[in-house]
């Protein structure tokens, strides 16, 4: 996992080049937006249980066959595994938000996840819907302007959305 700084410096160092003005400007913007990023991660982390629970409730309301006898989330053990997986995906999304880089999400969470679900007979499309529902919950919480650093957060929220979209696409 590389943060944005390490990634840029490593690339330039490998080429034997100085940082460009555009790269310095982009990294400076990242620093100036760091409080917004921290606020976003804190909000999502502080509400992780509610995000997962609400997303799961919504998913199971839309797809009741998942919790019916024979469904992939039927029995408390399978339900717990489903909620655990959703929580793990959410946790890695917060790591990506904090780092400003999706590599930790890709490398440590999503790599091979679709194959695992296929092997277990878990419908990837349902997992993807659950991830999208977590995205909706997380963005609603992160976009609440009460008690956070002021300023335009639209770019950060778009970035946050892409991490959830990557996760959903990886399992679909």
Curated annotation (Swiss-Prot):
InterPro entries: Globin-like_sf, Phycobilisome_asu/bsu, Phycobilisome_asu/bsu_sf, Phycocyanin_b
Gene3D superfamilies: Phycocyanins
Sites where the protein binds (2R,3E)-phycocyanobilin 2: 153
Keywords: Antenna complex, Bile pigment, Chromophore, Electron transport, Membrane, Methylation, Photosynthesis, Phycobilisome, Thylakoid, Transport
Entry keyword annotation includes Thylakoid: yes
Gene Ontology CC entries for this record: phycobilisome; plasma membrane-derived thylakoid membrane
PTM note: Contains two covalently linked bilin chromophores.
Subcellular locations according to the entry: Cellular thylakoid membrane
Post-translational modification N4-methylasparagine, affected residues: 72
Topology relative to the membrane: Peripheral membrane protein
Keyword Electron transport: yes
Main localisation: membrane
One GO term of the biological process aspect: photosynthesis
Residues the entry annotates as binding (2R,3E)-phycocyanobilin 1: 82
Subunit structure: Heterodimer of an alpha and a beta subunit, which further assembles into trimers and the trimers into hexamers.
Function summary: Light-harvesting photosynthetic bile pigment-protein from the phycobiliprotein complex (phycobilisome, PBS). Phycocyanin is the major phycobiliprotein in the PBS rod.
Similarity field: Belongs to the phycobiliprotein family.
Designated name of the protein: C-phycocyanin beta subunit
Species this protein is from: Synechocystis sp. (strain PCC 6701)
Lineage: Bacteria, Bacillati, Cyanobacteriota, Cyanophyceae, Oscillatoriophycideae
């Amino acid at each position: 996992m590389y943060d944005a700084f390490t990634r840029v410096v490593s690339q330039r160092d490998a080429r034997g080049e100085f940082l460009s003005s555009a790269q310095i400007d982009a990294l400076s913007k990242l620093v100036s937006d760091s409080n917004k990023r921290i606020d976003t991660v804190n909000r999502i982390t502080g509400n992780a249980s509610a995000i997962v629970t609400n997303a799961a409730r919504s998913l199971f309301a839309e797809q009741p066959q998942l919790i019916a006898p024979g469904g992939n989330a039927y029995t408390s053990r399978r339900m717990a595994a489903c909620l655990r997986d959703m929580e793990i995906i959410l946790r890695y999304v917060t790591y990506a938000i904090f780092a400003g880089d999706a590599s930790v999400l890709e490398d440590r969470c999503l790599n091979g996840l679709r194959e695992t679900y296929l092997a277990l007979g878990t419908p990837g499309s349902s997992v993807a819907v659950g991830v999208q529902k977590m995205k909706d919950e997380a963005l609603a919480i992160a976009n609440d302007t009460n008690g956070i650093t002021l300023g335009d957060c639209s770019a950060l929220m778009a970035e946050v959305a892409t991490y959830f979209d990557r996760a959903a696409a990886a399992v679909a």
